[in-house]
Amino acid sequence: MIIRAPTRTMTKSFNGRQMGFKFPSVENMPQNPLDEYHMNNHHLLNDNIAKSQQAQAHPHPPPHQKPISTDEDALSNINSDYTSGSNTNTNSGNSSNGYYSFANISDNTTPLPNKMYSYPSSPKSNESSEGGKMSELTVPKDEHNQSSQKSTEPMEVIPEDNGFTSMSLNVQSIPTADNFSFDIASSNSLRPGSTTDKPGVATLARTPSSNTSRSSLLSPSVRNPSSSSARIRQSKRRSQLKRSPSIRCKGGLLKYFHLLGSRIKKTLRKIKLALRGKNSKRQASYRRSTSSTAAPKVARKPQVNVTRASSKKELTSHLKRTNGYVSNLKRSMSQRSLRPLLETPEKCATAGSLHTPHPDTSSSDAFVTPPGSRIVRNPTTSLRRTPSSIRRAASVIRTPIPAVPSATVAPSESFVYEDATTASPGSANGSENRSGLVRSTASKSLNSLVRQRSIVVKNKVIPLSMHQYSIKEEDEDKEHDSQFMIRPSSDYSLSPVHSVSSEGNGSNYDSDFEKYYSTGDYTDAYEDAEMGSFISSKRTSSTNTSSTAASSDAVSYTESVVPSVEPTVEPAVESKSIDDGEDIDETTDSVSFNNEIEELRSNINHYFRCVIARRIKLRLQFSHYESSNSLSPSYLDIMESLLKDYDDESTAGKDPAEFNTIDEEDEVAASELWSPRDSKTGSIRVNVQTPYLKRGPTQHSLISLNSRDVRRSLTLPIGMKV
């Protein structure tokens, strides 16, 4: 078994462990502020250089002083490399030797007041084999050059502390960024008398090629006042220096002044054009007046209607063209199709015929713009269709206007809305301007129809919302008895008209009365009735709870409910009947209209008596059952009767033909469905089914599904658990 010991067991950094030495940071800074000498680590390097010089100067130390070993040699810590002889690391060929080497550090953390830095040039240090041969490197010091550099050169490296802090006590230091390595010299500092060469000092050599490149890149451009062209050329030349990124940002001053200058240029250009146009108009009027007074008898040539070159230009911008707006096309067909809608009803009555276009509109010069006239575009939208406009037209569906009796409608107004009761085949635009499409009208947009909540069960979409959308389609032949007409009676079984007609009150209605209600939105009427019943039940339950809680008779309670509900509906209907009764000559239409209003009033009263009173009774009995907290047979009978009443209420909204002919099989199925008692356990088993499920396409909704058939999909709402 071979155990490999690591070669590098301890890292030595300046005669101590690596964990003992910490670079200065916010965590280990003392509370009192430190100067620049204690904030950097270059004095450690300088002290070690002095220590190595002292060790070389005294090879035999005194007996009381500890001798310096080869491992703790400070100079080998600094100037060591992988191949040095003093390195005892056996793995020195391909790894670190365990010592820090500060030979490559070059930053501007050690500034000095003067610009002269030198390595020790003693003969002992030059003769030493480990330190190598070191020569002094000097940068000439000239006060005039320093001031000129600070004033003209923006790229000169600026020390961090501007030379006002303390420095190391040792004279020796390493060259940093403040001296020769990153010093950028300008053309003013490169004069031949500026450098003072000292004897015995190797100066930094500067080649003439670097001088020319530096002076050409960094020297500021000197203007020649003699030639104006050179001045203009130099002023337009961009400077080679980099700007600060803070000026180039969006909110900087450069952006602000650039925008300001462009705005001023635009306004000046507009003012110049306006003044030029005024002067040209004035000169043209002056020439016209002088020519008319000078030669009034000269026969003028007949003006030929020739379009200018400016009128032949395209007047449509590319932004409008992307939206489908083209202004320079000859649209004779679209203008001809839109003309009957643009003309007023008075023009329609005076014309007395269909709007046939004039023969000159189809000619080629009908849409040519005259040279002196202004171009007035048609404000109406064109018939050009883009996919976005088709989508917009499909999503916005007009709400139907309720039908008015045909005697009050003028024949000139029937071309906008062709209703089932008003439009006749002989009326204006009734049979000619037919689009050939089945027009659908609804009370809600297609977005709400498509975006309703739904789940997918066995690859079939099942809606979760109970909304009934009143989509009524009209055939293009306007046939009322067509097989494609969707009757609202099959969809809206809880409407006030048909729910009352099932009871036998006013079962035969006029055809006009059915037409009057065929265009209505029963969803809104049903919601209003629900709100009214809820408010009335709140009012009556607050006043009559003490009197009705003990009694189980619901008839007396329904008699007390009706007077509070009836005044909410009757005044508007009575005002209509009074206004109709004040007419002096009552025709047969007004009599039938009054009869319809009376029937409507009785139907609404019957609806409130039957449906809403039954719901109030249901709520009271539920509250009575919850307060008892017992499962005696009497309360089980109450629950069974409640569920049967609720079942009767759900079946009360069928068609009159279906209501009277209920099969016995349906009754047996209903009794099996609604029986609350379980024969095996004797407990209550309630299968709640709302009256919404008995009608419409949502019969097989989420409540009537088995749990094994329902699977989660992406269309399921987030907050719902199945």
Curated annotation (Swiss-Prot):
Annotated Gene Ontology cellular component terms: cellular bud neck
Compositional bias annotation for Low complexity: 79-94, 117-132, 206-229, 286-295, 558-575
Biased composition range(s): Basic residues: 275-285
Biased composition annotated in UniProt, kind: Polar residues: 187-197, 378-389, 490-510
Subcellular location, record wording: Bud neck
Cleaved signal peptide residues: none
Positions of region (Disordered): 52-94, 110-161, 187-245, 275-325, 349-389, 488-511, 558-588
Sequence similarity: Belongs to the AIM44 family.
Name of this protein: Altered inheritance of mitochondria protein 44
Lineage: Eukaryota, Fungi, Dikarya, Ascomycota, Saccharomycotina
Gene coding for it: AIM44
